């Protein structure tokens, strides 16, 4: 068999990095439109950072002994200049880097939001992918518990806007650095007493990041973790006042919550408030949004000491919930599908289609698949399949008479039959279609 005749191997996407196909894109667009409207209502501004950042941004910002930095980052050396680069595994550090680099905080606090793909090298499973998408907010320059409460309440409002139920809020306080240090000493002492019962992961974290042992999912360690010293018992007056202030605001705004003393988060930059929104509808991957306060991070990345808080949520997980609860909106078709037969009709169809688009109507103009003109019957099948509200038809008679034939494709008339085809002068076509679209929408509301 010659090289030319040998069948080429079919190329596929990278495992854990998924295509978003047209039949799924409508749900993504619905979520994105909903969340963007919400963020505008809270005065947040969009920021877009590169997918690739210098690796030290994450090792310094997230923490060298976190799972993300140790095991999950896609890092490489740039062949052009030898720089160590990484596909972003999260976006808080990148937003902070941008705020520092562009001196964004010189005139006061900023409310920022982002949306886009993140990358982590881990085993793909439901709700956890190697390329995944997050939307997140960063409130930079706000020190009080009121900012914490506001970003938590934003999530609550989003669940309501989407129609989601059964997502529960868990909160905790990680206190200040000196309080965590005192707790760390006692926690290590306690875990050392049970060292023979710890699994490999807990053994590895015992002296590098013992707080993360409290977050273990291993059933065999749950009793040990349950009886471990609680960080909340080491909080000083400032930390307690902050945490109590958050709780008062949440209660005043009817936001139910549970205090979870084991909630520690997987990133080293957090202090004081941490929170997660969790559900039992996604199996082991139950966290759909998480965040908290990260006051040390801006100084840690080279900026002036600045308070900050934020959250991120996994879009794929939220879309899974929308499907689980049958909240997927019906995708609407275009307004008009233009059908034509003959060269003169095709020219007229092009002109009219552009004119209709000028008025804001969504229009598909039939184009042949094989370069030859398709039959009227096959074009009408395509028009029906497109989900369009109306077919606008041009043939020899229509071109000669300066008209278009308009056929409704959705619904039925008052007699239960499909609405009849009408001949409309071309100069009146736009007005006719707009009025017909309004009438169709009103009928649908009845």
UniProtKB/Swiss-Prot annotation:
Query: Does this entry carry the keyword Nucleotide-binding?
Result: yes
Alphabetical list of CDD domains matching this protein: HisRS-like_core, HisRS_anticodon
Gene it is expressed from: hisS
Mention one GO biological process in which this protein takes part, according to its record: histidyl-tRNA aminoacylation
Give the matching InterPro entries. aa-tRNA-synth_II, aa-tRNA-synth_II/BPL/LPL, Anticodon-bd, Anticodon-bd_dom_sf, His-tRNA-ligase, HisRS-like_core, HisRS/HisZ, HisRS_anticodon
Q: Which HAMAP family match?
A: His_tRNA_synth
The annotated region (Disordered) lies at 403-422
What GO MF annotations does this protein's record show? ATP binding; histidine-tRNA ligase activity
Q: Which UniProt keywords apply?
A: Aminoacyl-tRNA synthetase, ATP-binding, Cytoplasm, Ligase, Nucleotide-binding, Protein biosynthesis
Q: Which GO terms describe its cellular component?
A: cytoplasm
Name the predominant localization.
cytoplasm
Q: What is its EC number?
A: 6.1.1.21
Family to which this protein belongs: Belongs to the class-II aminoacyl-tRNA synthetase family.
Oligomeric state and partners? Homodimer.
Output the PROSITE patterns linked to this UniProt entry: AA_TRNA_LIGASE_II
Species this chain originates from: Burkholderia thailandensis (strain ATCC 700388 / DSM 13276 / CCUG 48851 / CIP 106301 / E264)
Spell out where the chain crosses the membrane. Answer: none
UniProt-recorded name of the protein: Histidine--tRNA ligase
Name the catalysed reactions: tRNA(His) + L-histidine + ATP = L-histidyl-tRNA(His) + AMP + diphosphate + H(+)
Subcellular localization is given as:
Cytoplasm
């Amino acid at each position: 068999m010659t090289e030319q005749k040998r069948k080429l191997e079919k190329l596929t996407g990278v495992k854990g990095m998924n295509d978003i196909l047209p039949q799924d894109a409508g749900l993504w667009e619905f979520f994105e439109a909903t969340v963007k409207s919400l963020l505008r209502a809270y005065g947040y501004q969009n920021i877009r950072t590169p997918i690739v950042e210098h690796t030290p941004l994450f090792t310094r910002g997230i923490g060298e002994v976190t799972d993300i930095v140790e095991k999950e980052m896609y890092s490489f050396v740039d062949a052009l200049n030898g720089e160590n680069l990484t596909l972003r595994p999260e976006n808080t550090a990148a937003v902070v880097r941008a705020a520092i680099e562009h001196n964004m905080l010189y005139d006061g606090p900023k409310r920022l939001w982002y949306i886009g793909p993140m990358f982590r090298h881990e085993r793909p499973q439901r709700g956890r992918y190697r390329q995944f998408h997050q939307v997140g907010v960063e409130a930079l320059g706000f020190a009080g518990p009121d900012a914490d409460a506001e970003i938590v309440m934003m999530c609550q409002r989003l669940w309501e806007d989407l129609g989601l139920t059964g997502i529960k809020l868990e909160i905790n306080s990680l206190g200040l650095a000196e309080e965590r240090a005192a707790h760390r000493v006692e926690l290590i002492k306690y875990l050392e007493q049970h060292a023979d019962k710890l699994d490999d992961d807990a053994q590895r974290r015992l002296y590098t990041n013992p707080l993360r042992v409290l977050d273990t999912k291993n059933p065999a360690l749950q009793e040990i973790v349950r009886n471990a010293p609680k960080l909340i018992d080491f909080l000083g007056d400032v930390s307690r006042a902050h945490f109590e202030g958050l709780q008062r605001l949440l209660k005043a705004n009817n936001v139910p919550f549970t205090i979870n003393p084991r909630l520690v988060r997987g990133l080293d930059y957090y202090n004081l408030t941490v929170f997660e929104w969790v559900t039992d509808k996604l199996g082991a991957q139950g966290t759909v949004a998480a965040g908290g306060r990260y006051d040390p991070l801006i100084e840690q990345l080279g900026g002036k000491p600045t308070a900050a808080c934020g959250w991120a949520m996994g879009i794929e997980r939220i879309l899974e919930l929308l499907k689980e609860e049958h909240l997927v909106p019906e995708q609407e078709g275009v307004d008009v599908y233009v059908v034509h037969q003959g060269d003169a009709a095709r020219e007229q169809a092009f002109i009219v289609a552009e004119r209709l688009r000028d008025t804001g109507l969504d229009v598909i103009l039939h184009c042949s698949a094989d370069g030859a003109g398709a039959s009227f019957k096959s074009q009408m099948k395509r028009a029906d399949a497109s989900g369009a509200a109306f077919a606008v038809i041009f043939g020899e008679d229509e071109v000669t008479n300066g008209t278009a034939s308009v056929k409704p494709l959705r619904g039925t008339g008052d007699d239960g039959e499909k609405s009849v085809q009408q001949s409309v002068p071309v100069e009146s076509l736009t007005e006719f279609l707009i009025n017909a679209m309004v009438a169709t929408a009103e009928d649908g509301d009845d």
